[in-house]
Regions:
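Bacterial N-terminal signal peptides that target proteins for export
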Residues: 2-13
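Bacterial N-terminal signal peptides
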Residues: 12-22
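Carbohydrate-interacting regions of secretory-pathway proteins
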Residues: 26-244
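Serine residues within intrinsically disordered or low-complexity segments
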Residues: 5, 22-25
Length: 244
């Protein structure tokens, strides 16, 4: 084979190898898929029979036509009947009034719920917050304090005795993971939350994009609790998938 033939063979081989390397590199860099559509094997819906009352009134939580409605009164929670460790979760929610406040508590142990009185929230768990945009104005007006220690975009933070190392950006005191993007919609509009919880790490996607999270949670096994906190809110399409 002469030099021209060798050179041509080299460039032909290179044209085949480079795209293959690029494809391989792309596959390595692609992040794990988040199953935000809640479709596929293992996903299941959570309905009325999957929840147990904790410290609400009989009419605090009502189910009708696929919707779960919370009156917001008294303050408290409702829990799942089973505990979860590693899982994916999707839930849609909307506040029915401006300045509404609610959330999902993750990894809540038995001791935090035993004999919990009305108008009291658990002192354990990681909260995935659901606030309406009007909440900050209401808080500042009623308290006379600056509402810079929270956002209305999907904060994640440990409650009471639970521990979590929040991902940045952080709240001024470092206790909360503030969202990287502002994606939540105002009262009357549905928001979609996707949560992935694995080995003490929690990540939140709001309306399709990852925004906040944390790791090093303790405890990292427990109930999922929906929060009633003074204002009416609705939930739908609550689905979970347990992970190894």
């Amino acid at each position: 084979m002469n030099r021209v033939s060798i050179r041509r063979a080299f460039w032909a081989a290179l044209l085949l190898v480079v795209p293959a390397l690029s494809l391989h590199s792309g596959l390595l860099q692609e992040p794990p898929r988040a199953f935000m559509d809640a479709a596929g094997p293992g996903w299941r819906s959570l309905g009325e029979s999957d929840f147990a009352p904790v410290n609400g009134n009989p009419d605090t939580w009502t189910w009708k036509d696929g919707l779960l409605r919370c009156s917001g009164k008294p303050i408290g929670v409702m829990r799942t009947r089973e505990k979860f460790t590693n899982f994916e979760m999707v839930i849609e929610w909307r506040h029915l009034k401006a300045a509404g406040n609610s959330g999902v508590f993750v990894w809540v142990p038995d001791e935090a719920l035993a004999q919990l009185k009305p108008d009291v929230l658990p002192d354990f768990g990681i909260e995935v917050q659901m606030l309406d945009h009007g909440y900050r104005e209401q808080y500042e007006k009623e308290s006379g304090k600056k509402g810079d220690w929270f956002t209305t975009q999907g904060d994640i933070f440990p409650v009471g005795k639970s521990k979590l190392k929040p991902f940045p950006p952080l709240s001024p005191d470092g206790s909360r993971s503030f969202p990287r993007k502002n994606l939540t919609l105002g009262f009357g509009e549905w928001n979609h939350y996707y949560v992935r919880a694995i080995n003490g790490e929690l990540r939140l996607w709001v309306n399709g994009e990852e925004v906040s999270g944390g790791n090093g949670a303790d405890p990292r096994t427990g109930y999922l609790c929906l929060e009633s906190e003074g204002s009416p809110v609705e939930f739908k399409n609550f689905r979970v998938r347990e992970l190894p």
